[in-house]
Amino acid sequence: MSSQQQKQPCTPPPQLQQQQVKQPCQPPPQEPCIPKTKEPCHPKVPEPCHPKVPEPCQPKVPEPCHPKVPEPCPSIVTPAPAQQKTKQK
């Protein structure tokens, strides 16, 4: 009986030791991987976003908006009174 008891406690210690060695090996490679992806992501997003948005948005919006609004306005107002004159005749 004593021989069986000695075998049981002997088998679990080696298994636990193997698992402990594998666990610390896995986290180190994962840790350096996370910061690497964050570093290139942050600088790439703000750099192209800021210069691209204000440059094309500001010049394109005010230029085509101002000339388009006054042009169609007078053309629509002129036919309105013209039609009224023909009806009065």
From Swiss-Prot:
Tissue specificity of this protein: Suprabasal layers of squamous-differentiated tissues such as epidermis, esophagus, tongue and trachea.
Region (Disordered): 1-29
Modification after translation (UniProt): The N-terminus is blocked.
Coiled-coil intervals: none
Principal location class: cytoplasm
MF annotations from Gene Ontology: structural molecule activity
Sorted UniProt keywords: Cytoplasm, Keratinization, Repeat
Keyword Repeat applies: yes
Compartments where located: Cytoplasm
Pfam families, sorted: Cornifin (PF02389)
Region (2 X 12 AA approximate repeats): 3-29
Region called 6 X 8 AA approximate tandem repeats, residue ranges: 31-78
Induction: By carcinogenic agents and by UV light. During squamous differentiation of epidermal keratinocytes.
GO cellular component, as recorded: cornified envelope; cytoplasm; cytosol
Extent of the Sequence repeats: 3-14, 18-29, 31-38, 39-46, 47-54, 55-62, 63-70, 71-78
GO BP of this protein: epidermis development; keratinization; keratinocyte differentiation; peptide cross-linking
Family: Belongs to the cornifin (SPRR) family.
Function field: Cross-linked envelope protein of keratinocytes. It is a keratinocyte protein that first appears in the cell cytosol, but ultimately becomes cross-linked to membrane proteins by transglutaminase. All that results in the formation of an insoluble envelope beneath the plasma membrane. Can function as both amine donor and acceptor in transglutaminase-mediated cross-linkage.
The protein's name in its UniProt record: Cornifin-B
Native organism: Homo sapiens (Human)
